[in-house]
Amino acid sequence: MYIVQIASECAPVIKAGGLGDVVYGLSRELEVRGHCVELVLPKYDTMRYDQIWGLHDAYRDLWVPWYGGAIHCSVYCGWVHGRLCFFIEPHSGDNFFNRGCYYGCPDDNMRFAFFSKAALEFLLKSNKRPDIIHCHDWQTGLVPVLLFEIYKYHGMENQRVCYTIHNFKHQGFGGPEILWATGLNREPYYFHYDRLRDNFNPFALNFMKGGIVFSNFVTTVSPTHALEARFGNYNYGLGHTLYLHQHKFRGVLNGIDYDIWNPEIDRFIPFHYTAQTLENKAKNKKALRDQLWLQDVDKPIVAYIGRLDEQKGVHLVHHAIYRSLFKNAQFVLLGSATEPGIGAWFAHEKRYLNDNPDVHIELGFNEELSHLIYAGADILVVPSHYEPCGLTQMIGLKYGTVPVVRGVGGLVDTVFDRDYDTRKLPEQRNGYVFYHTDRAALESALDRAIDLWYTAPDQFRQLQVQGMSYDYSWNYPGKEYLEIYEFIRHR
């Protein structure tokens, strides 16, 4: 099959979060399976040009219809770790992608509405006719709308769209100006409850809702999160829309790239290891202590790696630090705050605990250090308030770092409680799970993990081995997506 991914991110060249990893990992898996995959991305001024090989002009004179006129664009082509990528650069006074950032501009809705239009215009004018167009999150929610309302009448009638929602919280909103700009000129038609009109605000268009309504198939990033979105509180107002389109909605668990996250070959850790050579994990633990100036004592290391925000359960992350110390464990935190107040809170904790030889708080993100923490820590806490998929716990399992997670979203699909999970046999369980968002719930799981490390080291090692035996690569998700592609291709 010929597959084109249209997205706002692709790691490592454009990466603001997990979306970039997913777009790259899925593309790579599809190519390994023998399919032709190309990516269409914005040409941001801040993307990592050092990660692109052979960047050159591919289409110099792309004129994208916009507000009754047209904006001139250049399309550049280059290879990102073997993936063929096209980068769209508009030449206009709006400077849509020359802002010094990927997201966070007041006109993000207009920026990505233009990108969606430009991506389809590029496919049309360059005579690219993929079997499948796979687009991601609200930034490309208008792609299926534009394809089936405009471009199918210009020679793109045979293309099918798979639309993946990575986070329902961010949906993308706009007013009538979006319709005027993109050429969707029938305002009363699109401002209808079963098309683009937002379910709560009758004066707003909802990009994500448009993606759901007009695409051929909709996925989200784990089976449990699909259920939460359909029946729970994590759809942020799109529950009824998902109900109307439940026949084409499914959760597909993300994978992780084992060429990057693999203790057997990881270039960022000093000692490689497997489930059969876990003694080398202990050597990485010592290396981690030496680098972070933790005291070299016989204690478990509990770690947290990720954003510091409400979604990630930041109040429980904070409590995990002090609970670990109370249970005679060490704690390592690597995280970046998205809100100034949370950043100031953890900066204060860093200063307060600076002289404690059992704690290290590293604010910001450090790719190399994250690998060493996964390899050196014994326990990984993931106390998310909600978690559509989560990659952290999958990486932890691969590195033999026992996850302690809250039972939501993709965490439910990947971590099985050692003591209580009835879905798996005892020899298939791989971590600890709690369900409520209070401190006592976290303690109930974290204490069991630390106690097992102290009282039954052989059983703790066996739990590590069981976690490392799980395959959370892109192998199975790639197969699922190909089944979806084949299904919609012949509809």
UniProtKB/Swiss-Prot annotation:
Record EC number: 2.4.1.21
SUPFAM superfamilies tied to this protein: UDP-Glycosyltransferase/glycogen phosphorylase
One Pfam match: Glycos_transf_1
InterPro entries named among the record's database cross-references: Glyco_trans_1, GS/SS, Starch_synth_cat_dom
Biological process per Gene Ontology, one example term: glycogen biosynthetic process
Enzyme class: transferase
Pathway recorded for this protein: Glycan biosynthesis; glycogen biosynthesis
MF terms in GO: alpha-1,4-glucan glucosyltransferase (ADP-glucose donor) activity; alpha-1,4-glucan glucosyltransferase (UDP-glucose donor) activity
Keywords tagged on the record: Glycogen biosynthesis, Glycosyltransferase, Transferase
Reaction it catalyzes: [(1->4)-alpha-D-glucosyl](n) + ADP-alpha-D-glucose = [(1->4)-alpha-D-glucosyl](n+1) + ADP + H(+)
Membrane-crossing segments per the record: none
Sequence positions that bind ADP-alpha-D-glucose: 15
HAMAP family in the cross-refs: Glycogen_synth
Role description: Synthesizes alpha-1,4-glucan chains using ADP-glucose.
UniProt family annotation: Belongs to the glycosyltransferase 1 family. Bacterial/plant glycogen synthase subfamily.
Protein name: Glycogen synthase 1
